[in-house]
């Protein structure tokens, strides 16, 4: 039996919005497998949806450059928001991004090696660890970029108006699509969601045959919700992004979205445990 920790229960609660006891029970039944617990909670109606894994906890910046025919995003991390605004840290981050733009195709390993000496010197000066974490390139006839407070960076590639593509980049920053078009959603992702929706319908009392027919309509809605062109446009929710693009004679071929600290989880201090430790367990 896997250990069901308080942090695991908290993560499940954060991702599903369900109560603490429901989350603990679901984790026990799933033997600590949080993804299985989420699926089971959705099937039973305890959770309507779940946020994607990977809490954003690390600090740092996302920077972007657009050159002729391509764009690049660079993520540089540090430990605190204070250092993320430091002139020395930002200076190095900009230097790294300029180098990446001037040397298209540079790998993250090569980028880290190129600036290791300067990084180490800045760490010694500031007294806080930092690292060049990610670099991502995007090719395209027209490239638009959007930075949201240096915490989210988006590149959108396509054809047509750069100004209209920038609006789409702003949409990507806000709505986090996973695919460009509904038909791009992988068969594996679709089938996984389809099975969950069938179980939800069956658990609500519908016969299997009827449940399967009901789900077909839901799956079209699902693929639209996770794809860029199928989503409601944030600047005009009455139309989809796809319809907006058609109206301005513009198309999107691909996009990249990076957010500071994706997939990195800072160690959170357990306040109650710390108090118990200090007081000898008598708190």
Swiss-Prot record:
Protein biosynthesis as UniProt keyword: yes
Keywords: Cytoplasm, Elongation factor, Protein biosynthesis
Name assigned to this protein: Elongation factor Ts
Location in the cell: Cytoplasm
Tree of life domain: Bacteria
Organism: Haemophilus influenzae (strain ATCC 51907 / DSM 11121 / KW20 / Rd)
Function per UniProt: Associates with the EF-Tu.GDP complex and induces the exchange of GDP to GTP. It remains bound to the aminoacyl-tRNA.EF-Tu.GTP complex up to the GTP hydrolysis stage on the ribosome.
Entry-linked PROSITE patterns: EF_TS_1, EF_TS_2
Gene Ontology, cellular component aspect: cytoplasm
Main location group: cytoplasm
